[in-house]
């Protein structure tokens, strides 16, 4: 019996074959995948659903955003939200462009009418710069220890209800939320499985994010329905190494997977190279039945070449199945199961996408909406139970997408041949498809112009796509009107570099850039450029001379300004670049931007790994954004040097370097470290954020021996980065006292301090400081770092009383959570030094009495430690209110959520940063 609700797919799979598995490879891990049975997945998701149901933002039947960067989290929380009776809405990866990212989050909030998103602690920073959506870190929900829900809220759903929200391609534009019902999804899965039967004891293979309709429906849900295993791998690992893709298919006896045309070409090239090697690899692909291919045009020659190669390893000749589908049709719904023979027989340069599966119908119409006979080009329209019914909260887009008689207008053009096979012939709407991903040309143009690139005239930028003869995927072409003189070659090169950087960060693809004179960029009477006319002129070759001259001038400029490596580090990096790009030193030097060699996102990933191997990193530790922002060997060498070079003691730690407002300075708590501020700083994007870190952590450093010593060091550190005010300083707990003292010193020297913040510390602290000996400091540190629980720290305080430091240290290491200890990369010597730093900080404050006044004070108060006050009101009114004695104006109090140790932790940092930013604004900062 066919299930009617999506949760039934998992429940049935868990009951029918509890050993069916989800197999997951993490980034860079090719040897030791994680495996979770369908039975265990149901239990895990059921536990997580309790946390969703109990969250303060929970509303039955509402949409819940999911934003994760790995398959396991997406899968678990997809089911958790469904089982809690809500609608999962899986977000695509956010843009690297901060402006686009914030705009997208605000758009998601207004579209879904939601103000929260489940995510991971590692991704909290991606929600910076906006207040529309609060990120909720799943690590803070404590769901692992919950009991599985006895029954699920989802059983109340009806087959026609929305089960899942997926977003149309909107990497650079405003995406639409597609409502996919239980009935629609189940109908689509049944239709897909009927097209090509799959063998038992085989598996599905997915390598794209679960936000993509092909991953969540065509692989994850269909595998459950078919009672087969499913394998999920990171896309970057597969795309950069097609041979591993073949290894995976052989290892896991994959019967169904997918690959767009560009990746089919990479697999073909890898197999050709393998055949030429001295010891060619062999694979058993006899279980492979179905390599679905779509998202961009498939060349018949590529499909034919690869089909022949795969056939030699046991796959059927028609294993590559070009098709057509959209998010609105639950991915592929029209399939060509006779490729490449059918396409060769009919002399097609680009393959047909075939005929409809059960559950969908197609027609091709003219401009009046009348169906056209075979062979005539028109608009492709679809209908049937597999086709969606509406975009969420967007009636205008929904109405525009359907004909009066209820057919969905795909926006694509095509013809039906005499056999009812569909041959696509372009898109009615302006869309760019790069490596199977859609982008809006208008939004790319906007991103370029919003960067105010010197050398580019605003409103004369035009972006479009073009598929060159013999190419496997489209390229982005961008033409613009320059402001520089034609003979200003440095400006010409700098403008091209700036444009390339913006487009690469937005799309992962390097654009083909051509500066044109204004006569070639005519505007309409409404002041608009005609993208279609400009594209047609480009494809007719009318810009070929301008393009050739531009390339030649920039190449000569690079040659004339060629630079040699300054040191061995630059030399080593240059060799990696040359080897990765397979170019000579005549073509590339330490100051050549990587965009100049035509690098794309896949080659960038390969370059990143080559550099990591050269530097001896065991794991992928260089953030990709480092390569995107530092595009020459020289820039990258400097950036890596700053990241990893040991430094002499400097109290200043740069947590966030960007923004045009005056910096915010944050002073460490009693532990001396500034790690606690990292998540907070990520949300403050309009100003630099610096932290002041205590002395004594590095070998050979001595901790501060007095408050004056620390204040002088911090004062000098502040002045070295920010010579002039107005200043904004704040401290967490113990750091509040130091922030107050540094503020006084600044004012004494004639500077304006406009903001002083105390994060939950009263002015009088010496009695508490005297209570904390070395053992207590270490126990507080262990609890603060989540190595032990607060309860256990109090028990150990008694058990370890009177013992020597070495014994105490070893006892706490033995008690520590081993996974957390390893996660923090702790060692016995470092933990001992850390305890020394914390103890010395408390010791030097044992006689501290506050005196003097600062202009103002903002106190951010949370639930206090039990030892400090009996209630929050007592804490504020009796203890914290004493700051009034040390300010020249009344203290402003800010009630913040959480407890003393969690107020700026992952669970509460989003709310805290909103209150902090508001307080800064109220002080004129």
UniProtKB/Swiss-Prot annotation:
Annotated GO biological process: fatty acid biosynthetic process
GO CC, alphabetical: cytoplasm
Family under the similarity heading: Belongs to the ATP-dependent AMP-binding enzyme family.
Gene null: resulting phenotype: Results in white conidia.
Region Thioesterase (TE) domain: start-end pairs: 663-923
Pfam families in the cross-refs: AMP-binding, PP-binding, Thioesterase
Organism placement in taxonomy: Eukaryota, Fungi, Dikarya, Ascomycota, Pezizomycotina
Domain Carrier: 564-644
Protein name, per record: Aspulvinone E synthetase melA
Cross-referenced InterPro entries: AB_hydrolase_fold, ACP-like_sf, AMP-bd_C_sf, AMP-binding_CS, AMP-dep_synth/lig_dom, ANL_N_sf, PKS_PP-bd, PP-bd_ACP
The encoding gene: melA
TM region(s), chain numbering: none
EC identifiers of the protein: 2.3.1.-
Gene3D superfamilies per UniProt: 3.30.300.30, ACP-like, alpha/beta hydrolase, N-terminal domain of ligase-like
Role of this protein: Nonribosomal peptide synthase; part of the gene cluster that mediates the biosynthesis of Asp-melanin, a pigment that confers resistance against UV light and hampers phagocytosis by soil amoeba. The nonribosomal peptide synthase melA converts 4-hydroxyphenylpyruvate (4-HPPA) to aspulvinone E. The tyrosinase tyrP then performs hydroxylations of both aromatic moieties of aspulvinone E. The product of tyrP is highly unstable, and, due to the high reactivity of methides and ortho-diquinones, the polymeric Asp-melanin forms spontaneously.
Region (Adenylation (A) domain): 11-434
MF terms in GO: phosphopantetheine binding; transferase activity; very long-chain fatty acid-CoA ligase activity
Entry remark concerning the domains of this protein: MelA has a A-T-TE domain architecture. The adenylation (A) domain recognizes and activates the aryl acid substrates, and loads them onto the thiolation (T) domain. The thioesterase (TE) domain shares the missing condensation (C) domain function, and is responsible for condensation and final product release.
Record key words, sorted: Cytoplasm, Phosphopantetheine, Phosphoprotein, Transferase
Gene induction: Expression is induced during conidiation.
Major location (coarse): cytoplasm
EC class name: transferase
Modified residues (O-(pantetheine 4'-phosphoryl)serine): 601
Domain of life: Eukaryota
């Amino acid at each position: 019996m066919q299930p009617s609700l999506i949760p039934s797919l998992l429940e049935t799979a868990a009951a029918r074959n509890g050993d069916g598995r989800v197999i997951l490879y993490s980034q860079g891990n090719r040897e030791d995948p994680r495996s979770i049975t369908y039975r265990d997945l149901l239990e895990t998701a059921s536990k997580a659903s309790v946390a969703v149901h109990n969250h303060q933002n929970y509303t039955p039947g509402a949409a819940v955003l999911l934003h994760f960067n790995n398959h396991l989290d997406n899968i678990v929380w997809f089911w958790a939200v469904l089982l809690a009776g809500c609608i999962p809405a899986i977000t695509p990866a956010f843009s690297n462009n901060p402006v686009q990212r914030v705009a997208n989050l605000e758009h998601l909030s207004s579209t879904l009418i939601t103000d929260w998103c489940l995510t991971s602690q590692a991704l909290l920073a991606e929600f910076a710069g906006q207040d529309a959506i609060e990120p909720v870190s799943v690590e803070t929900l404590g769901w692992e220890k919950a009991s599985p829900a006895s029954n699920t809220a989802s059983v109340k759903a009806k087959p026609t209800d929305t089960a899942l929200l997926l977003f149309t391609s909107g990497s650079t534009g405003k995406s639409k939320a597609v409502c996919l019902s239980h009935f629609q999804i189940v109908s689509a899965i049944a239709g897909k499985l009927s097209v090509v039967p799959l063998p038992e004891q085989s598996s599905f293979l997915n390598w794209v994010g679960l936000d993509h309709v092909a991953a969540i429906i065509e692989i994850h849900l269909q595998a459950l329905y078919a009672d087969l295993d499913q394998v999920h791998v990171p896309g970057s690992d597969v795309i950069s190494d097609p041979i591993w893709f073949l290894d995976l298919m052989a290892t896991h006896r994959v019967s169904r997977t997918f690959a767009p045309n560009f990746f089919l070409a990479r697999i073909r090239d890898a197999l050709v190279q393998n055949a030429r090697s001295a010891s060619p690899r062999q694979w058993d692909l006899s279980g492979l039945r179905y390599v679905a291919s779509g998202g961009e045009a498939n060349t018949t020659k590529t499909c034919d070449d690869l089909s022949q190669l795969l056939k030699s390893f046991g796959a059927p000749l028609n294993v590559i199945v070009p098709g057509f589908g959209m998010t609105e049709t639950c991915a592929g719904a029209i399939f060509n199961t006779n490729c490449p023979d059918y396409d060769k027989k009919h002399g097609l340069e680009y393959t047909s996408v075939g005929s409809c599966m059960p559950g969908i119908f197609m027609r091709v119409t003219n401009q009046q909406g009348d169906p056209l006979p075979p062979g005539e080009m028109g608009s492709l329209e679809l209908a049937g139970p597999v086709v969606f019914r509406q975009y969420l909260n967007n009636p205008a887009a929904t109405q525009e997408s359907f004909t009066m008689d209820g057919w969905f207008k795909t926006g694509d053009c095509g013809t039906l041949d005499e056999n009812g096979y569909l041959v696509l012939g372009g898109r009615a709407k302006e869309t760019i498809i790069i490596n199977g991903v859609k982008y809006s040309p208008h939004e790319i143009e906007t991103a370029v112009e919003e960067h105010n690139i010197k050398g580019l005239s605003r409103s004369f930028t035009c972006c479009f796509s073009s598929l060159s003869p013999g190419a496997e995927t489209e390229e982005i072409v961008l033409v613009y009107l320059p402001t520089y003189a034609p003979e200003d070659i440095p400006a010409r090169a700098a403008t091209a570099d700036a444009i390339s950087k913006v487009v690469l960060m937005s799309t992962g693809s390097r654009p083909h850039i051509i500066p044109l004179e204004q006569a070639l960029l005519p505007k309409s009477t409404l002041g608009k450029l005609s993208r279609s006319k400009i594209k047609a002129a480009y494809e007719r070759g009318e810009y070929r001379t301008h393009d050739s001259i531009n390339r030649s001038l920039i190449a000569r400029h690079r040659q004339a300004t060629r630079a040699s490596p300054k040191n061995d580090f630059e030399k080593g990096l240059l060799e990696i670049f040359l080897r990765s790009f397979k170019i000579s030193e005549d073509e590339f030097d330490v100051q050549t931007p990587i965009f100049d060699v035509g690098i794309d996102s896949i080659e960038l990933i390969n370059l990143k790994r080559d550099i990591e191997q050269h530097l001896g990193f065991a794991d992928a530790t260089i953030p990709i954004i480092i390569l995107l922002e530092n595009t020459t060997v020289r820039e990258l060498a400097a950036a890596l040097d700053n990241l990893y070079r040991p430094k002499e003691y400097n109290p200043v730690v740069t947590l966030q370097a960007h923004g045009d407002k005056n910096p915010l300075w944050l002073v460490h708590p009693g532990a001396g470290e500034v790690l606690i501020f990292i998540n907070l700083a990520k949300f403050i994007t309009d100003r630099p954020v610096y932290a002041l870190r205590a002395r004594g952590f590095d070998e050979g450093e001595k901790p501060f021996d007095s408050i004056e010593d620390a204040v002088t060091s911090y004062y000098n550190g502040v002045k070295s980065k920010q010579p002039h005010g107005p200043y904004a300083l704040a401290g967490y707990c113990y750091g509040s006292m130091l922030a107050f003292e540094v503020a006084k010193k600044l004012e004494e020297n004639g500077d304006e301090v406009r903001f002083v913040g105390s994060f939950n510390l009263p002015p009088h602290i010496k009695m508490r400081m005297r209570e904390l000996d070395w053992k207590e400091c270490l126990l507080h540190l262990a609890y603060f770092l989540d190595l032990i629980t607060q309860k256990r720290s109090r028990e150990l305080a008694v058990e370890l009383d009177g013992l020597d430091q070495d014994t105490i240290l070893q006892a706490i290491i033995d008690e520590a959570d081993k996974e957390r200890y390893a996660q923090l990369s702790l060692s016995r010597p470092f933990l001992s030094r850390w305890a020394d730093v914390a103890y010395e900080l408390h010791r030097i404050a044992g006689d501290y009495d506050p005196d003097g006044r600062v202009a103002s004070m903002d106190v951010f108060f949370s639930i206090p430690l039990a030892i400090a006050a009996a209630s929050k009101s007592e804490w504020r009114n009796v203890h914290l209110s004493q700051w009034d004695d040390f300010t020249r104006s009344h203290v402003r109090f800010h009630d913040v959520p959480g407890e003393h140790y969690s107020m700026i932790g992952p669970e509460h940092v989003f709310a805290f940063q909103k209150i902090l930013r508001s307080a800064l604004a109220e002080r004129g900062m």
